[in-house]
């Protein structure tokens, strides 16, 4: 039986790079993958997954209303799919995570999701929370804080590098808006003890 995977980390750990490498590995063995990414993350262009290393690929774009299982099954009718790869999985709805689990459980298609656990305020994203609860396999990718400790948090900063302590859960951005840090330094920046 296929599995549902969730690879998670703080920002800037190389999740998209890893996803693109997995796609390459499947295709190198003449297997077919379906790459998917949320429409709201258009930093690399709509329907595109890109890494900070400069590599990228086109992907199927979806919204929080898209029935992901239906999309995958429709594409499977055109060509077999050996693996589904989801970038920015924190933006999945709870229902979409369950849809992806049905692809693994019913359709026997491995689904690999890549995303961050928590937002800039330390709260779990709904999609990440469900993935952490039901994924068959959890994989933590590691990156480091400026102090050298493992970074587990993503700090949102303004143009001057000051921590933003409140705001919308979702604010698309990269290295210019987010800094990965350990919990201790995240708490200090957020004014918490």
From Swiss-Prot:
ATP binds at residues 9-16, 87-90. It is found in: Cytoplasm. It catalyses: thymidine + ATP = dTMP + ADP + H(+). It is an enzyme of class 2 (transferase). Pfam families: TK. One of its GO terms (cellular component) is cytosol. InterPro entries: P-loop_NTPase, Thymidine_kinase, Thymidine_kinase_CS. GO terms for molecular function: ATP binding; thymidine kinase activity; zinc ion binding. One of its GO terms (biological process) is thymidine metabolic process. Its EC number is 2.7.1.21. The keyword Cell membrane does not apply. Homotetramer. Belongs to the thymidine kinase family. HAMAP family: Thymidine_kinase (MF_00124). This is Thymidine kinase. The lineage of its organism: Bacteria, Pseudomonadati, Pseudomonadota, Gammaproteobacteria, Alteromonadales.
